[in-house]
Amino acid sequence: VADTGLDRSHERSTAGRNPSRRAQARRAVVVPPITYPEQLPVSARRREISAAIRDHQVVIVAGETGSGKTTQIPKILLELGRGRDGQIGHTQPRRIAARTVAERIAFELGTSLGEIVGYQVRFTDESSERTLVKVMTDG
């Protein structure tokens, strides 16, 4: 069998993937058990929302103010395994909102801000390489 160089080329192209796979495995391990406040409407519809996200590329969730869209949907995404290949981006219109939303999600997950959940506004980046959900302003 002649050596065409394809095997070596394949080895080189896949060699860089192993660290990525290890990082994915590490990121999957850090997700704590996820709970949902029963009083929030989004929590009650979590299975439907989860199925829609899993089955469709774009999902629009509409609900009343205070229904849990902002804080519970990132947790649903984590439960679906999102955030392993890259961060879950979560935008908020104002800096204070971005910070307080990140704080709330981190609190509900029982983690420190900047670990699994972080935020970035202007010149402040409170996140790390382990951050799975990053809340940020859209500007």
Language-model regions: role of each:
Residues 1-58, 73-76, 80:
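Helicase-associated low-complexity/disordered flanking segments
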